[in-house]
């Protein structure tokens, strides 16, 4: 495009020229004194650069961007955001999650809480006549805004086309509205609509796959999504509690990575130990926990017996999953997923309104796991519980129940990390790190602070005692090959 030249008025004779110059100067000074116009939220969202496309890494263990940069999935369950929040509320929530270092928010188009018949904040329901082939433009215009605003803030949307009660009404409001034909049409419509946005498709919605017909519905919806977006976005499946997508659809070509719902118990055994089972499956696919125990949730759905979870419970789930091979992690808060406030019927006893819950300690501590792992080689990380020396009483170390120790390292053995969920002494095989000398540090998962311990030879096992004892005082031991010169844990590369 040719450059534009400023239009300069010709000088006028006498007083007219003087007046004109004064007017022009005054206008210039006024323009310089005014603040630059601020784009509206909608304009900012529309003008934002697209988020990088994501793909599965070459070793099939992680997600990377189109430039092969590692992508750390730090998700949050915002299941009802499209259905319950207006734009002001959504803006408050999204700003908070972006500030806290989250990278994904998980949200449902056809929502759980009577999502077909109870309208959104602007009075719109998602479908005409409960027909997936007749989406309501007014409803999805609001979905558009939230998706694009999230993207503008650097957040991908883990987009569930529907909650599971619309294809398997094992429980919930339903009704069941999907068959293979309309599921494919609905998927294609969504794919076309969001093909250029930063979304990750999540099928399922907290229900098991129990029949061939249900399996066919999911496959048809995935086929429609891929046809609509041209295969631009990854696809996974959110399973029912205590299960993983791998149990039903691991071999399906449309499934790019596995998702587990380890759920709302606080024990390692029987839930969190199952991530390693999915990690070991072939063909190899990345895996993460898309719904672990929520903060402030009734533990095992039985608050009278076990009480409500606290930040320590959600931290344990984070490191149990990551160190067992997950490529990322999803956090959740019991008030936030349902966006509960005093105007709504509470589901399973939330403790405080969502506007306060978004700043609970667990939410603020999740990003420490991200910064820790991003400060070391990322795409070569593997589970490595064999770093830990079993105690004479193995239920102490590596432990059991809420107090299970787990470890990870990279394949080149330049570093190793051990998560200690309780402040008790434990021993490690120093030879797990390849260097002759090993630099040891403590990383505090509650604050993100790192403290040097010292440098030690790698030719013998060594016992380490966490800086503080106590069952809610968890620690991470970081062992580095001293020759690599890595920065302190959590301080970047």
Residue ranges, per PLM feature:
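Aromatic- and carboxylate-lined catalytic core of secreted/periplasmic carbohydrate-active enzymes
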Residues: 69, 286, 295-297, 310-454, ...
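Extracellular glycoside hydrolase catalytic/binding regions
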Residues: 192, 199, 205-358
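Signal peptide processing junction and immediate N-terminal pro/mature segment
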Residues: 34-44
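Bacterial N-terminal signal peptides
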Residues: 22-35
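Active-site mouth of glycoside hydrolases
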Residues: 49-51, 55-269
